[in-house]
C-alpha cells in the first residue's frame, strides 16, 4: 500500500466532502466503486482514520490553523488548500506515527499537484509555525 497516494486520496475525499456535504461513509464507498486504479494501492484504513480524525477534531484543527495565519482569515483559504492544511495539521497534532517532517513534505507535494507555487509557500509557512508550537 502506498501512504503517499493514500494521503492524496484522503485530501481529495475531504475536499469533495466539503463541497458535497457527503458523509465519510458515502464518500469512501463512492470512491472505492469508482476508483480506476488498483484499489489495493490505497490504504483505506489510513484514509478513513484521517477523515475521521479531521472530522472529530475539525474545530481544534481550524483554530490552530487560524492562530497561525498572518493577516488572513481561514474563510479566505481555497477549499483545496484548506483540505491540505487540515490533513497536515491533523497529522502534526494527533498522528504520532507520522514524522512531522513527513507530514509537512507530503502536504507540500500535494499542494504542488493541486495548487500553485504561492500556495506551496503559504502552506509551508503555516505548517512550519504549527510545527513549532
From Swiss-Prot:
Q: Does the keyword RNA-binding apply?
A: yes
The protein's matches in Gene3D superfamilies, at most eight in alphabetical order, are given as: NusB-like
Keywords recorded for this protein, A-Z:
RNA-binding, Transcription, Transcription antitermination, Transcription regulation
Q: Biological process GO annotation list?
A: DNA-templated transcription termination; transcription antitermination
Q: Name one GO molecular function term.
A: RNA binding
**In this record, what's one Pfam family?**
NusB
Q: Which domain of life is it from?
A: Bacteria
Q: Which InterPro entries match?
A: NusB-like_sf, NusB_fam, NusB_RsmB_TIM44
Keyword RNA-binding appears in the UniProt entry: yes
Could you name the Gene Ontology cellular component terms for this entry? cytosol
Family, per entry: Belongs to the NusB family.
What's the stated role of this polypeptide?
Answer: Involved in transcription antitermination. Required for transcription of ribosomal RNA (rRNA) genes. Binds specifically to the boxA antiterminator sequence of the ribosomal RNA (rrn) operons.
PANTHER family recorded: ANTITERMINATION NUSB DOMAIN-CONTAINING PROTEIN, N UTILIZATION SUBSTANCE PROTEIN B-RELATED
HAMAP family found in the cross-reference section: NusB (MF_00073)
Name of the protein this chain belongs to: Transcription antitermination protein NusB
Q: Which organism is it from?
A: Clostridium beijerinckii (strain ATCC 51743 / NCIMB 8052) (Clostridium acetobutylicum)
Gene name tied to this protein: nusB
Amino acid at each position: 500500500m502506498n501512504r503517499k497516494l493514500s494521503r492524496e486520496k484522503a485530501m481529495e475525499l475531504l475536499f469533495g466532502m466539503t463541497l458535497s456535504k457527503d458523509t465519510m461513509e458515502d464518500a469512501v464507498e463512492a470512491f472505492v466503486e469508482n476508483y480506476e486504479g488498483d484499489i489495493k494501492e490505497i490504504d483505506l484504513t489510513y484514509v478513513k482514520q484521517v477523515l475521521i480524525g479531521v472530522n472529530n477534531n475539525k474545530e481544534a484543527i481550524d483554530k490552530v490553523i487560524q492562530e497561525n495565519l498572518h493577516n488572513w482569515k481561514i474563510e479566505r483559504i481555497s477549499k483545496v488548500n484548506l483540505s491540505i492544511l487540515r490533513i497536515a495539521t491533523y497529522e502534526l497534532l494527533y498522528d504520532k506515527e507520522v514524522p512531522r517532517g513527513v507530514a509537512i513534505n507530503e502536504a507540500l507535494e500535494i499542494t504542488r499537484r493541486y495548487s500553485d507555487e504561492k500556495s506551496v509557500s503559504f502552506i509551508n509557512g503555516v505548517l512550519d509555525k504549527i510545527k513549532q508550537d
